[in-house]
Amino acid sequence: EDLHVSVMGHEVLKGVSLEIGEGEIHALFGPNGSGKTTLLNTVMGFSRYKVTKGAIYFKGQDITRATIDERARLGVGISFQRPPTVAGVTLRSLISLSSPSRTNEEIESTAEALDAKDFLDREINAGLSGGEMKRTEMLQIILQSPALVCLDEPESGVDLQNMSLIGKAARTALGRDSFDGTNCRHAMKLRRAGYKSGLIITHTGQIMDHLFVDKGHVLMNGEIVCSGNASELLSEIRDHGYTECFRCAGCERGVCK
């Protein structure tokens, strides 16, 4: 709510207000450098992102000053666009720390479904391709099972062959295993217990071929300038670029509701 965030003394987010309902998935569009990743990392609580004004609420609780660990325990999870390599730490050991209730059988079966079993006993992300890193990130988020799933460009570095696998993993992470695409016009009516909330950064919109997204937002220069139907927003961006989005704040076109 009215979130202002600075990084190294530079204000990146300038009054962002965004509400994601329980079980909703929202997409976040915007050009490079607009503040999208800053928003996700601030929600997760990384220390270099300083909230100078406004607040973050989760499940009715003010978590603005909560630590990363506290937010994770409450049910906030994130998958990075460019996850770091961690020397000396295996993926299996990290999962055991972040998801202590998971059995080894659960870890291995989930990894096998993501074609990531061979990475469990390797150093985290060491020597992995972009697509392989994405699979290990999705493995971690599925096993953590957070109530709010934040995905930073899940399509980045993923080839077409693996995109369907990432899409399926995203559905699992968000509790939508039974949903098979965006053609379900009654998705809102079919909500069931177990649906997670999601905030997904996407440039290409490919992930929307695999998930029903309830709403989209365009972030530019640290401010949300458009909100509306995610598919229509994406179509507008593809046709006209982001310059048209500046007009959305006061326009009456259907895409800018």
Model-based region annotation:
Residues 44:
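Helix-to-loop junction immediately C-terminal to a conserved catalytic motif
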Residues 210, 215, 219, 223-247:
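Conserved beta-strand-loop-alpha-helix hinge in the C-terminal portion
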Residues 78-82, 88-106:
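Q-loop/switch helix immediately C-terminal to the Walker
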Residues 29-31:
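The feature captures the beta-strand-to-loop junction immediately N-terminal to the Walker
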Residues 50, 62-77, 237:
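ABC ATPase NBD coupling module
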Residues 52-61, 111:
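Conserved ABC transporter NBD signature motif
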Residues 13-15, 20:
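Conserved structural motif at the start of ABC-family nucleotide-binding domains
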Residues 150-154, 159-161:
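Walker B catalytic motif
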